[in-house]
């Protein structure tokens, strides 16, 4: 058993999954964790900071250009690796350039650059998701996506932890440069680790409207209209509550009275071990229980962890930060990393299982877009909601938003049914 598990984990494919997770997570966490603290340091209001989160909308709309990445691609590295490299180089450059402008006087420029970061990050996600689905067998999806998700979460330790610690010592421009250079890990993977998968390229010769329509048609024919609609509704709702809760997570912690150094130290000390714990547990649980049962179990865990933010918000602003306050923050952050990490791992494995390998880019982009769209659209209003009712009521609202997604599991992932086969054309 031990040797069998080790032989599944320590492979080139799983190493690539770790790299895809890290490079997918880094730019997103810059926008969701590092950017709000930078804007707060520049004395922008909570309403403006919440509105700026609207730049993350490309994550919810990436299905619109996903067919282009299947159909058109530079020839120098192949269909997947060419787009990987182009998006990663663009992100490396943009993550530094954004720091050259003052948000207080040039907020429009900063927002536009952040929008470009989100666009290239979403583009990278399209290709990385498709690539990962193409290199992993159905049996490897649970473990591979667990490794991807936890590397994705660990990537958040840089903009959400180490970079904030450095920001207390160095100018923000230096911090953004250091953070941007971390994208070199993805460039290394693309050039030296990843190999172009061998996939039937017949669909790339079709007219563009067919490249967009046929993957959707295949999905609805395979699932049936009613089941397909239920599946898409589930994608829309399952991560709604916890995604909305974490939209202003770093801003919330900052407003509670914790310094950048406090956030960095606590995140560094708790998020790493909790990510590793959830990664090991999540992969083994999915191998044992299957994806459907994992969705139920992990969904309940991620919903309960929203309660941690409610508990912390109930204390109000801390005038003095002692070890007791740091301990409280550590408990909440650890629970959040475990809960969201587990829930996301099962969710991503579920989406990958339901996609057809011939149309991975378009179908996975549609699936992940639907899961991201609610929080990205309503995230624009998050600052105004907090400004109107406060953090305590806001997190209660997020908890109730998580319930409809759990109810959808009765429809799309019954406990007594486990489909481990991915349909193909």
Swiss-Prot record:
SUPFAM superfamilies membership: MFS general substrate transporter
Gene Ontology CC: plasma membrane
InterPro entries per the UniProt record, alphabetical: AmpG_permease/AT-1, MFS, MFS_trans_sf
Keywords: Cell inner membrane, Cell membrane, Membrane, Transmembrane, Transmembrane helix, Transport
Pfam families per UniProt: MFS_1 (PF07690)
KW Transmembrane (keyword) present: yes
Membrane topology value: Multi-pass membrane protein
Effect of mutating residue 32 to L: In strain: RM 7004
Subcellular location: Cell inner membrane
Transmembrane segments: 15-35, 48-68, 84-104, 107-127, 149-169, 174-194, 225-245, 271-291, 295-315, 331-351, 370-390, 395-415
Mutation effect (residue 313 to S): In strain: RM 7004
Molecular function per GO: transmembrane transporter activity
Outcome of mutating residue 5 to F: In strain: RM 7004
Alphabetized NCBIfam families for the sequence: 2A0125 (TIGR00901)
Listed PANTHER family: MAJOR FACILITATOR SUPERFAMILY DOMAIN-CONTAINING PROTEIN 3, SOLUTE CARRIER FAMILY 33 ACETYL-COA TRANSPORTER -RELATED
Family to which this protein belongs: To E.coli AmpG and yeast YBR220c.
Protein name as it appears in the record: Uncharacterized protein HI_0350
Lineage: Bacteria, Pseudomonadati, Pseudomonadota, Gammaproteobacteria, Pasteurellales
């Amino acid at each position: 058993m031990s040797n069998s598990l080790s032989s599944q984990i320590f492979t080139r494919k799983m190493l690539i999954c770790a790299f895809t997770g890290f490079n997918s997570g880094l730019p997103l966490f810059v926008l969701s964790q590092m950017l709000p603290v930078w804007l707060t340091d520049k004395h922008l209001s909570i309403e403006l900071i919440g509105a700026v989160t609207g730049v993350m909308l490309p994550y919810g709309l990436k299905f619109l250009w996903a067919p282009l990445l299947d159909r058109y691609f530079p020839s120098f590295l192949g269909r997947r690796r060419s787009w990987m490299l182009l998006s990663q180089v663009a992100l490396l450059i943009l993550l530094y350039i954004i720091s050259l402008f003052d948000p207080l006087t040039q907020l429009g420029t900063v927002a536009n650059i952040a929008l470009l970061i989100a666009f290239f990050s979403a583009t990278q996600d399209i290709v990385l998701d498709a690539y990962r689905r193409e290199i992993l067998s159905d049996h490897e999806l649970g473990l591979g996506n667990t490794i991807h998700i936890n590397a994705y979460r660990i990537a958040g330790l840089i903009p959400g932890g180490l970079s904030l610690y450095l920001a207390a010592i160095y100018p923000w421009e230096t911090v953004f440069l250091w953070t941007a250079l971390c994208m070199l890990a993805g460039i290394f993977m693309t050039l030296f680790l990843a190999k172009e998968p061998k996939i039937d390229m017949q669909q790339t010769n079709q007219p563009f409207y067919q490249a967009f329509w046929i993957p959707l048609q295949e999905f609805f024919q395979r699932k049936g209209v009613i089941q397909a609609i239920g599946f898409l509704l589930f994608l829309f709702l399952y991560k709604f509550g916890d995604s909305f809760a974490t939209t202003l997570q770093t801003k919330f912690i900052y407003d509670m009275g914790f310094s950048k150094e406090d956030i960095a130290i606590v995140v560094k000390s708790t998020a790493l071990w909790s990510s590793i714990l959830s990664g090991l547990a999540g992969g083994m649980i999915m191998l044992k229980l299957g994806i459907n049962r994992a969705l139920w179990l992990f969904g309940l865990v991620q919903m309960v962890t929203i309660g941690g933010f409610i508990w912390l918000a109930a204390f109000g602003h801390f005038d003095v930060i002692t070890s007791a306050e740091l301990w409280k923050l550590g408990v909440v952050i650890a629970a959040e990393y475990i809960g969201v990490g587990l829930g996301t791992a099962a969710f991503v494995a579920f989406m990958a299982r339901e996609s057809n390998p011939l149309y991975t880019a378009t179908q996975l982009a549609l699936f992940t877009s639907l899961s991201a769209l609610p929080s990205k659209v309503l995230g624009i209003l998050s600052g105004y909601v907090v400004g109107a009712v406060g953090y305590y009521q806001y997190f209660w609202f997020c908890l109730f938003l998580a319930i409809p997604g759990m109810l959808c599991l009765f429809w799309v992932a019954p406990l007594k049914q486990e489909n481990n086969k991915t349909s193909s054309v």
